[in-house]
Every structure is written in C-alpha cells, then in structure tokens.
From Swiss-Prot:
InterPro entries membership: 6-blade_b-propeller_TolB-like, PD40
Keywords for the protein's UniProt record, in alphabetical order: Periplasm, Signal
Predominant place of localization: periplasm
Domain of life: Bacteria
UniProt keyword Signal present: yes
Subcellular location: Periplasm
Organism: Chlamydia trachomatis serovar D (strain ATCC VR-885 / DSM 19411 / UW-3/Cx)
The protein's name in its UniProt record: Protein TolB homolog
Length: 431
C-alpha cells in the first residue's frame, strides 16, 4: 500500500499539492461590463393560494434568473427590457413564454412542479439552460452536475479516505455517490447522452483500479482485468476509447482501450508510447476522439503534449513552450481550447491555450495552488480545486469575466472536480 501511495504522489495533479495558504477571494481581472450583456426581463405571473406557495414560486423565479446570468451573456432583470420571459404559474404547472419587443408573447414550453425542492430546482436549471441556448445559441450551464472527491480534513492515516459526491454549481443539493470506505479520486463523466455514467479510480481493492458507476448506484464495478496500478481515466464517446495511465510495465505509461458501456472492455489495452517518453499522465481527448493531450516529463519537467491517435497514430508534439511545469490538460467541448495548470512564480495557476492562434493565457493570479480544471458545456467556464496539501475548495472560473468564485459546500478537502451530465437543451416546437 505504501508503494502505491508513493507512486500516486509522483504523478501529476493528484493528492500532493505544493504548500500554500488558502485564500478564497474572488479574482478581479478584466471584468466584463454590464452594457455588453443582453438584458432579459423575467416576470412571474401567479395567483398563489397562500403565502408559502407565493414564497416558493418567487424563490424559483429568482433561481431561474441566477441560472440565466450564470453564463455571463444575459442580464436578467425585473425591469423593462427588449425581451421578456414570462413564467406563468398555475400551480403545479409553470408555462414559459417569450415576448420580443413589438411582438406578441409566444409559449416556449411548460413543466410541472413536484413540490420536492431538489427535483424542482433541477427542472428550473434545465428550463433556464434551454432558454439560454434559445436566446444566445450558447449552451446554458446551470443544469450540469459537478462530481468530486471529498476527504476529511487533517486525516491521520497515510492514505486518506475519500468518497465521491455531486453538487450543483451553486453548492446546493450536495449528494453522496459512493460509500466504499476507501479512497476514490479523479472522477470523469463519460458524456454519454441520457446516461449519467462516470469513471473513477478507487483504492478499495488495495491498489488503484478504474471503476465505472452511474449516479443512482452506491458502488462502482472494476472495468479492466490488466495488472498494475491504473490512474486518470478519460473516455471518448465518439471513438469509444478509454485512455488511462498504468505502470503495468514498470513506467507510468499512457494506454488506450476500446470500451463499450454495454459490453465493457473490448480487446486488450494498447500502450501508445515507450519509456523514452518518461512518466506520462493526465490524458484528455479532443471532442472528436482523434487526438489526446497529456503530460510527460521526458525533458526533465512536466510539459503538455498533443498527439493524433486516429485514424493513424502520429508522434507527440509539444503544445506550448511558454510554461515548463504544467499539468492537468483538458480539452474544451467546442474543441478550440485546452485548459491546464502551470507553476508561475511558484504558484500553480489555471491557464488556457487557444489552438487556432497558438497563444496561451494565464487566467488566475491568487496565491493558492490550483488543480484539476474541468469545462462546462459552454466552453466559457471551468470548475477547479484550489488549496494546499491538506485544504482544498472548489471554484468556478469564467473565461468571459476572468473572475473566480468559491462553491460553498462545507468542511473537508474537495478535489478532482468534473463538470458534466448536461441534459439536452433542444426545444421542441409548440403549437
């Protein structure tokens, strides 16, 4: 067990962060002005039967407005605006309509409340995201789920116990996903439509192995029979390939494995590189599944490389020469950007690389060390963890405003966040 811990700590962006003092302040860089946002009035039309129902409907209206504003493209208001979203409440039904300036109101869709705040909040998140997409053609991001590993702070054991949890972007509806009494890390959504499946690494068998689970199951199942430690899974639904790191042959190497949610692993894992490429880690697929980014220390310090793997494999090439101590690359859903971590002036910061221009940009500046950036569906927002060796919190980061804000959850170390499980935002035409 001790050897597994040493190996895990030698990999990038896992349990060991550089020492730092945690400061949970917002970042103040190039804030987008309100005048560049699209104003949208949100009006609740209701005749509640009592004050409790009135208060509940008003809270849902406010939640809907916050959801619309989350993407940093819309400015919801109770004042007059060129466009208005009407929420007509005929409890338990809510009817959403859109009125544009100089035109009549048109029904968009309706939903039925259950009276369960958790279910109703999710329904409002999904409604807001669908309307956000309708107005901006950019996906809304309030309806996704953030999964992460939660460990007790100041654990005295050498190998901490950490279960997986899910939470909404606003810190609400914190929900336990696993109850395995072990250490679970690096959860990753599989991004398969209508199936909230995710992979993660667990130590419940004594050594780190990759497991598969869904939101409604308390324990996952091991998916690979291969020997050795297994780390950092990532899945491409386009090519049905699983990429991961394993020390089966002695060195932490990058492997790919054909995988189906229905049948499991198909064939045997393929090692992509040899030991001449050093220790490898943190793979991430392009949206089309034909390329990977990953980290290698073959030149002495961890740097990020990009490699085509389909339809034929090409040699890796260095992604950026600007930073020499980088980790945790993750490809944006639109395929245009790669977010990553890099040590800048002694602090691990979040950066982003633009594939079209070849330019990279530092997004954060605060003094706590950051790790594990994960994209929202709009490719404009990230979730990441930040802290020190024994404290860690989750933060949301906007590439539009360049501001971060803490997700207030409670005590414990929150690490390895992954944002996903975004429902379809297609709106069917109504008569």
């Amino acid at each position: 067990m001790k050897g597994s811990v040493v190996f895990l700590r030698s990999l990038l962006c896992l349990l060991c962060l550089l020492p730092s003092t945690l400061h949970c302040e917002d970042l103040e860089i190039h804030v987008r002005s309100e005048s560049s946002l699209l104003p949208i009035a949100v009006s609740l039309l209701s005749s509640p039967k009592d004050s409790r129902q009135a208060s509940y409907l008003a809270s849902l209206r406010d939640l809907f407005a916050r959801d619309l504003a989350l993407g940093d493209l819309l400015a919801p208001t109770k004042e007059l605006a060129p466009q208005t979203i009407f929420i007509e409440a005929s409890y338990p039904e809510l009817i959403f309509s859109l009125k544009k300036e100089g035109k009549g109101s048109q029904k968009i869709f309706s939903l039925e409340l259950s009276g369960d705040p958790s279910k109703d909040h999710q329904a409002i998140h999904e409604a807001a995201d669908r309307i956000h997409f309708l107005l901006t053609r950019v996906p809304g991001i309030s309806s996704g789920k953030i999964i992460f590993s939660l460990c007790a702070t100041n654990s005295s054991t050498e190998l901490k116990q950490g279960e997986l949890w899910s939470v909404d972007y606003d810190g609400q509806h914190l929900y336990p996903l696993t109850n395995e009494h072990s250490l679970s890390v690096t959860p990753t959504w599989m991004h398969i439509s209508h199936i909230p499946a995710y992979m993660y690494v667990s130590y419940k068998l004594g050594v780190p192995k990759i497991f598969l689970n869904t939101l409604n199951q308390p324990a996952g199942k091991k998916i690979l029979a291969m020997q050795g430690n297994q780390f950092m899974p990532t899945f491409s639904p386009k090519t049905k390939l699983l990429a991961f790191i394993s020390d089966r042959d002695g060195n932490p190497d990058l492997f790919v494995q054909s995988f189906s949610l229905a049948t499991g692993a198909i064939g045997t894992p393929k090692k992509l590189l040899n030991e001449a490429f050093g220790t490898q880690g943190n793979p991430s697929f392009s949206p089309d599944g034909t390329r990977l980014v990953f980290v290698s220390n073959k030149d002495g310090t961890p740097r990020i490389y990009q490699m085509q793997i389909s339809p034929e494999q090409h040699s890796p090439r260095l992604l950026t020469k600007k930073y020499r101590n980088s980790s945790c690359p993750t490809w944006s859903p639109d395929g245009k950007k790669i977010a990553f971590c890099s040590v800048i002036k002694g602090v691990r910061q979040i950066c982003v690389y633009d594939l079209a221009s070849g330019r990279d940009e530092q997004l954060t500046t605060s003094t706590e060390h950051k790790e594990s950036p994960s994209w929202a569906a709009d490719s404009n927002h990230l979730v990441y963890s930040a802290g020190s060796s024994n404290t860690s919190e989750l933060f949301l980061l906007s590439l539009i405003t360049k501001k971060s804000r803490k997700i207030v959850i409670g005590s414990g170390e929150k690490r390895f966040p992954c944002w996903g499980a975004f429902p379809s935002q297609h709106i069917k035409k109504t008569s």
